[in-house]
Amino acid sequence: MAMAEGERTECAEPPRDEPPADGALKRAEELKTQANDYFKAKDYENAIKFYSQAIELNPSNAIYYGNRSLAYLRTECYGYALGDATRAIELDKKYIKGYYRRAASNMALGKFRAALRDYETVVKVKPHDKDAKMKYQECNKIVKQKAFERAIAGDEHKRSVVDSLDIESMTIEDEYSGPKLEDGKVTISFMKELMQWYKDQKKLHRKCAYQILVQVKEVLSKLSTLVETTLKETEKITVCGDTHGQFYDLLNIFELNGLPSETNPYIFNGDFVDRGSFSVEVILTLFGFKLLYPDHFHLLRGNHETDNMNQIYGFEGEVKAKYTAQMYELFSEVFEWLPLAQCINGKVLIMHGGLFSEDGVTLDDIRKIERNRQPPDSGPMCDLLWSDPQPQNGRSISKRGVSCQFGPDVTKAFLEENNLDYIIRSHEVKAEGYEVAHGGRCVTVFSAPNYCDQMGNKASYIHLQGSDLRPQFHQFTAVPHPNVKPMAYANTLLQLGMM
């Protein structure tokens, strides 16, 4: 489902008819050793590069594919990881790590039944392996939970969580000394107090959290799927990319660029939650500002504002740990109302993922998307959340295993058809925090520095001025945060080293 930046490494080639010569075998092993060293140093792009070179010399070695599959997993190239794991198994049906890798890939893609089949294979081969048993049991639990959720979803009369809440009867205990909404309303003083409260690692009272969620659902549900914003010549707006639960880096954005206000508007381009372990703090801060400045603070949906992602990458677990399962269900409802795209002055289109698997999509098609749902596996809604640019023309299979990759010609044609200048998207880590591709027509912005405490990347945000709309990039680096590791609330399989 997600991806990494950098040069695209080609998918595995089919084995040659003739076995490689001894010299080629030796060189392939040397390349594998180099790749392993890069992998240990967390330089996954170079690891992929050298595993690929080893595969070119000896395409019949299952281990090379298994190793490259793991490197793809680490860079969130789940589609490529799945292909390599499957090839490894085809080459050697006894290669157990291949089944682990394929299960991990399918888990990341939300294909839990397929993952369960591979974990089942591992358990049969290694019946006394505690790790294998634990992963099988955890995956089986998810499969059963999903089946239960589908059964409930089949009830057309399913009620909103809001209908079962009695917020007025919730009492705020005398010993609670934290921020409270003023007459049920978010104010700037509340927001300042909230951010300091969160900075001190304290929890907002559940009544206040529910008040924010109920109110922001009402606000978001009235918005169009495509938000259209007009900037006057003297006005500017700040566009931020993924924040992924990195609350202390979010505070740093506001420190560097100023707090949101009617004269300092923001757009946050999805993926507010998951991975980082302060996702609750990030999202309630963002929702608070949305309530305070509904016309000047904009939130677009990312692929991680979805149930499948939240179940695996930590947000669901974090909400349940800090609050309740019921509150997570309400978050899920709210996420479904987040707009999918925003257009500035009719010239700059912003979305989380990218462009479309098919030609001919118009802005009016985006407006007509019924977004109040979990995203489908294909189609325009899926593409807006999931697709990625590629340097070559045309389209190709997604490295993530979802949606597609689109080339410069696709971008140019879409912009010309819709009378746009360029697109801004997020969704991918970039070493410098941003990237300008497709001849300036496709801009990526990523706002989570040192992503997951391990990527070492810079982050950035963009200023757009109404007078010319040219992107002005502002880079920043990570700031310290409390000793809570990323993925602390992620699915147990991840914590068990699924990837």
Swiss-Prot record:
Example of a GO MF term: Hsp90 protein binding
Keywords: Acetylation, Alzheimer disease, Amyloid, Amyloidosis, Cell membrane, Cytoplasm, DNA damage, DNA repair, Hydrolase, Lipid-binding, Magnesium, Manganese, Membrane, Metal-binding, Neurodegeneration, Nucleus, Protein phosphatase, Repeat, TPR repeat
Region (Catalytic): 184-499
Gene Ontology cellular component terms for the protein in this record: cytosol; intracellular membrane-bounded organelle; nucleoplasm; nucleus; perikaryon; plasma membrane; protein folding chaperone complex; protein-containing complex
EC top class, as a word: hydrolase
Pfam families (UniProt xref): Metallophos, PPP5, TPR_1
Residues that hold Mn(2+) 2 according to the record: D271, N303, H352, H427
Catalytic reaction(s) noted: O-phospho-L-seryl-[protein] + H2O = L-seryl-[protein] + phosphate; O-phospho-L-threonyl-[protein] + H2O = L-threonyl-[protein] + phosphate
Region Required for autoinhibition, residue ranges: 495-499
Residues carrying N-acetylalanine: A2
Cofactor(s) named in the record: Mg(2+); Mn(2+)
PTM info: Activated by at least two different proteolytic cleavages producing a 56 kDa and a 50 kDa form.
Residues given in the record as substrate binding sites: H244, R275, N303, H304, R400, H427
Co-factor: note: Binds 2 Mg(2+) or Mn(2+) cations per subunit.
TPR repeat residue intervals: 28-61, 62-95, 96-129
Cross-referenced PROSITE patterns: SER_THR_PHOSPHATASE, TPR, TPR_REGION
Primary location class: nucleus
Keyword Magnesium: yes
Protein name: Serine/threonine-protein phosphatase 5
Species this chain originates from: Homo sapiens
